[in-house]
């Protein structure tokens, strides 16, 4: 049996019903115990990111990232890509550095453990 870890806090998940997050972590980070869906594949995100960069409505900076809004509905909680002023910043892996997101998550966790203040952070799986 493989050890599953929460994609927010990194601690082991012992609840058989939990898939990728502790209920408490999900409630704190997403505002709901329901896990939001991110209905995009990597190829779709890359195309959306290109169009947003060309129209100058992406989040500025060196690392590829998008602004996303978390929409809560009766049926499902879902992330949607917005130009600016989203609720979250989604950072994307690149072909050159495919594990950059996991490395940054580790860095944020380590900083928090050292007592440094950080922005809230979590890993979210893409549909692909």
Label every model-predicted segment.
Residues 1-46:
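Regulatory N- and C-terminal appendages and interdomain linkers associated
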């Amino acid at each position: 049996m493989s050890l599953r870890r929460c994609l927010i806090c990194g601690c082991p998940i012992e609840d058989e019903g939990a898939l990728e997050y502790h209920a408490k972590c999900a409630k704190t980070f997403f505002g709901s115990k329901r896990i939001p869906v991110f209905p995009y594949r990597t190829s779709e995100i890359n195309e959306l990111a290109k169009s947003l960069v060309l129209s100058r409505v992406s989040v500025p900076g060196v690392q590829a990232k998008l602004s996303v809004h978390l929409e809560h509905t009766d049926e499902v909680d879902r992330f949607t890509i917005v130009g600016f002023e989203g609720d979250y910043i989604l950072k994307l892996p690149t072909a050159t550095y495919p594990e950059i997101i996991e490395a940054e998550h580790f860095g944020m966790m380590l900083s928090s453990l050292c007592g440094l203040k950080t922005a809230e952070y979590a890993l979210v799986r893409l549909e692909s």
